[in-house]
């Protein structure tokens, strides 16, 4: 809790718990039922081109083909194309590269969950490349302390330093001809 947060940042004197005053009044409340939110994926060429994972899996070929056509219309060149449909193997989407990054994607919980999923599996040797950028140095330190970094590296992930950049494309760029998925904030 609060004691940990003061210690991990090394600035105990600067720490102040943020909370509403006793007599605080609000104009309204926004309640979000997080159990109703479904995981989504945004496809090229805009974050609004988004689908739930369930919808994508149920209509994989149709959605990817439509995305390829939309990109072709946008680019307007016959010598340049997007090939997503070739990433369908046995009715499932094959991903070649992944990035977990930034202040929104590189949170402790997100990285911990990825390490838990990957534990005992390997994605190295050309099968799947994963780069992980913790959102801050304190998050990196806690991931090291708890052994999460060890588990990620044992699974073939590359762990990089925290920096502001992966969200807008600095750092790992999509590999040539690869399908790359990213857990990060989207800047448009």
Annotate each predicted stretch with a short phrase.
Residues 3-4, 188:
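Short, small-residue-biased leader/transition segments that mark boundaries at the very start
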Residues 5-126, 132-161:
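Accessory "access/gating" subregions that flank catalytic or transport cores
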Residues 20, 186-188:
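Intervening/peripheral non-core polypeptide segments
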Residues 153, 157-161, 165-185:
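Flexible glycine/proline-rich, aromatic-decorated loop/lid segments
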């Amino acid at each position: 809790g609060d004691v940990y947060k003061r210690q991990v940042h090394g600035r105990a004197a600067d720490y102040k718990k943020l909370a509403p005053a006793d007599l605080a009044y609000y104009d309204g409340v926004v309640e979000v039922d997080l159990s109703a939110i479904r995981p989504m994926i945004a496809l090229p060429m805009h974050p609004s081109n988004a689908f739930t994972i369930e919808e994508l899996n149920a209509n994989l070929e149709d959605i990817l083909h439509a995305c390829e056509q939309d990109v072709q219309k946008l680019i307007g060149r016959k010598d340049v194309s997007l090939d997503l449909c070739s990433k369908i193997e046995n009715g499932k989407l094959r991903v070649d590269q992944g990035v977990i990054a930034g202040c929104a994607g590189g949170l402790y919980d997100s990285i911990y969950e990825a390490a838990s999923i990957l534990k005992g599996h390997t994605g190295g040797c050309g099968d799947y490349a994963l780069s992980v950028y913790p959102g801050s140095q304190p998050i990196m330190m806690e991931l090291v302390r708890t052994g999460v970094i060890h588990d990620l590296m044992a699974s073939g992930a590359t762990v990089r330093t925290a920096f502001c950049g992966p969200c807008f494309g600095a750092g790992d760029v999509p590999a040539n001809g690869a399908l790359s998925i990213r857990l990060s904030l989207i800047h448009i």
